[in-house]
Regions:
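HKD-type phospholipase D/PLD-like phosphodiesterase module
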Residues: 3-31, 41-140
Length: 140
């Protein structure tokens, strides 16, 4: 699409969830240099796993993958995140991480003003050229 319209930008609406998911997987497969990914919620379900595998395959091809997740929705995912972050071409960062990993509610009780700041971004960018943005998080 970019090659067909050099020097121009454009917008294309992805109205169906399946189309939006497929577009993300295709972008991950087509990326040559970078993938910059930000999500408020990333479920560890079928869709989340398939998209994670697409990011992992891209990293295996030498693509630099940067994943930013809001920590509010990562409860129970620390081992999954650590394994992903161990890949040399993948960086995982948590937005506004909780200090008490196992007792997150404690942070809400003692530090509400800080932990209530959340990142609701939903963005999937390949090679700084194509971006999918919008209201869809990752999950079934």
């Amino acid at each position: 699409m970019v090659e067909a319209h050099p020097g121009q930008s454009g917008v294309f609406a992805l109205q169906e969830g399946l189309d939006a998911f497929a577009a993300r997987v295709l972008l991950a497969g087509a990326a040559e240099h970078t993938l910059d990914v930000q999500y408020y919620i990333w479920h560890h379900d079928m869709s989340g796993t398939l998209l994670l595998e697409a990011l992992h395959r891209a990293a295996d091809r030498g693509v630099r993958v940067r994943l930013l997740l809001d920590d509010n929705n990562t409860a129970g995912l620390d081992p999954w995140i650590a394994a992903l972050d161990a890949h040399p071409n993948i960086e995982v960062r948590l937005f506004n991480p909780f200090k008490h990993r196992r007792w997150r509610v404690l942070d809400y009780l003692v530090d509400f003003a800080r932990v209530n700041r959340r990142m609701h971004n939903k963005s999937f960018t390949a090679d700084s050229q194509l971006t999918i943005i919008g209201g869809r998080n990752v999950g079934d």
